């Protein structure tokens, strides 16, 4: 996946997909009652980016639905997966379940159109704090209660805090999750981070008995770092410049080993070499 980073305004969906992104990441902020409120990052954010673009969450969902519904005039066939970077740091731990419920209701109504020809993209819920694992159950229970368990097929999970791999595995156990796991690793583009933990995550993915299905690395804006990440065997790279990732994927060394994922690829299935 060529993952466009910090896509928080509806107009940016087109912008990033046109540069080659087949996936986007969107920030979700919550109000004090655990309602998803805005698609907003705020200051500080990545170097060289405007941190302040935003929409009301439900408006963004409607724009995203248009971009991922075949037949819609705004439809972008290439856009297959969306990561919601859930900014739950503003919430108390005991609000995590509620946040999941409210998030699910919003997506069900405004993105999935209550199961009636809604958006088709796969959705990854990315949670920054292992203690907020009840958000997952809040979300999945709500989809079941509302009569749409089939949408769980479209749903994946990520803990984005760069925690020890063993601790992340425990959090998933508590959450009752087995499968559909993307493991992120990374840091803002203003700083450097090695690939030690990425390689650990890739090893877990390829071990046959690990919890990880896919690994992505963020935020990569340079060709050299892109090559290093691909050499380490990642499944996705999050970037402010999707065209940089596209360029590297077109280099002779990578063209034969990697291709950009399409909707027909299963994002929950570990790729066997």
UniProtKB/Swiss-Prot annotation:
* Disulfide linkage: 45-51, 47-190
Give the UniProt subcellular location, in the record's own words.
Answer: Secreted
In terms of domain of life, where is this protein from?
A: Eukaryota
The main location class comes to secreted
Binding residues for Mg(2+): 25, 27, 85
The protein's Enzyme Commission number: 4.6.1.-
> What is the recorded name of this protein?
Dermonecrotic toxin LhSicTox-alphaIA1i
State the organism named in the record.
Loxosceles hirsuta (Recluse spider)
């Amino acid at each position: 996946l060529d993952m466009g980073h910090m896509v928080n305004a509806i107009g940016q969906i087109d912008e990033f997909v046109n540069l080659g992104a087949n996936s986007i990441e969107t920030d979700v902020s919550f109000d004090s009652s655990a309602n998803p409120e805005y698609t907003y990052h705020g200051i500080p954010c990545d170097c060289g980016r405007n941190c302040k673009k935003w929409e009301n969450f439900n408006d963004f969902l409607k724009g995203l639905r248009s971009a991922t519904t075949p037949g819609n005039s705004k439809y972008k066939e290439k856009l297959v997966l969306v990561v919601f970077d859930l900014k739950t740091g503003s919430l108390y731990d005991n609000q995590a379940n509620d946040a999941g419920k409210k998030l699910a209701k919003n997506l069900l109504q405004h993105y999935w159109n209550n199961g009636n020809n809604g958006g088709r993209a796969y959705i990854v819920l990315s949670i920054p704090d292992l203690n907020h694992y009840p958000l997952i159950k809040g979300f999945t229970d709500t989809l079941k209660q509302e009569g749409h368990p089939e949408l769980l097929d479209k749903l994946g999970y990520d803990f984005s805090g760069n925690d020890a791999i063993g601790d992340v595995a425990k959090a998933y156990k508590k959450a009752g999750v087995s499968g559909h796991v993307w493991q992120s690793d990374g840091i803002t583009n203003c700083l450097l981070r090695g690939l030690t933990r990425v390689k650990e995550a890739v090893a877990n993915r390829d071990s046959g008995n690990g919890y990880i299905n896919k690994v992505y690395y963020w935020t990569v804006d340079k060709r050299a770092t892109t090559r290093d990440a691909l050499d380490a065997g990642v499944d996705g790279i999050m970037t402010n410049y999707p065209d940089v990732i596209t360029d590297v994927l077109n280099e002779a060394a990578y063209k034969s080993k990697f291709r950009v994922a399409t909707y027909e690829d299963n994002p929950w299935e570990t790729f066997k070499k």
